[in-house]
Amino acid sequence: MTLISVILSFIVIMGFAITTHIMFKQKKLSRIKNDFVNNMTHELKTPISTISLATQMLKDHSIPESSKNLSNISRIIDDETTRLRLQVEKVLKTAVFNSGKMKIKFKTLDLHQIIDHVVKSFYIQVENQNGKIEKEMKAENAVAKVDEVHFTNLMFNLLDNAVKYSNGKPEIKVETRNFNHGILIAVEDQGIGIKKKDQKKIFDQFYRVHTGNVHNVKGFGLGLNYVKKMVEEHNGSIKLISEYKKGSRFEIIIPQQ
């Protein structure tokens, strides 16, 4: 009888432990989902509001045509429309990737050319924040088989991340070198860094480093998750080296064989 009681007690305790674990997991997933929805709402609302204000200015008959600065207004609408499109595409690409329907088209390309193109697209943004981007292209052989679109996107995400977490004026370094029959590409910043407890989760889908304000740093928490998946699709690897309040360095290795 005692043995049966012990077994029953053990079953009850295990059942309680499993139920509690499931409840905590569901609560965590619910919190992540709510954070994602809040961030997505904020990210989509901002460009929509800006476009709305710009169009109201165009329709406002009380403002003289000469004072409206039409070229500036049209540029704002164009920029915000592009921003809105990129945000929507980012969510859709993640959904397609998770469904397993995304196709990778490998081509032999010079990665230095792609990296240079992406870096140039950030020059104005970084200069407007009184920052700088340095390039150290040390790889003697920068040719590898990659998907041009996705490799461009993953580089864009890494640089975008470096700018977002710059904590003031961005100081970013992009470097390449040949390493173990591959090309090592590093994006390094002098930003806020990442705490040890967050580093293991940094590549999780929807995960965003807490900065005290949920809207302090824009984004859905999809960027680094996408980067990791795409590096793995290229049979490569990614590593994070970070020190809190001192900056982060992301290193990816793309094989060349």
Which residue ranges define each predicted feature?
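Short alpha-helical segment of the dimerization/phosphotransfer core of two-component systems
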Residues: 79-84
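Conserved micro-motifs of the catalytic ATP-binding
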Residues: 99-104, 143-146
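Short helix-loop "hinge" at the ATP-lid/N-box region of the Bergerat-fold HATPase_c
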Residues: 162-163
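Short beta-strand/loop element within the Bergerat-fold HATPase_c
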Residues: 169-181
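Detector for a conserved hydrophobic position within an alpha-helical segment of the HATPase_c
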Residues: 231-232
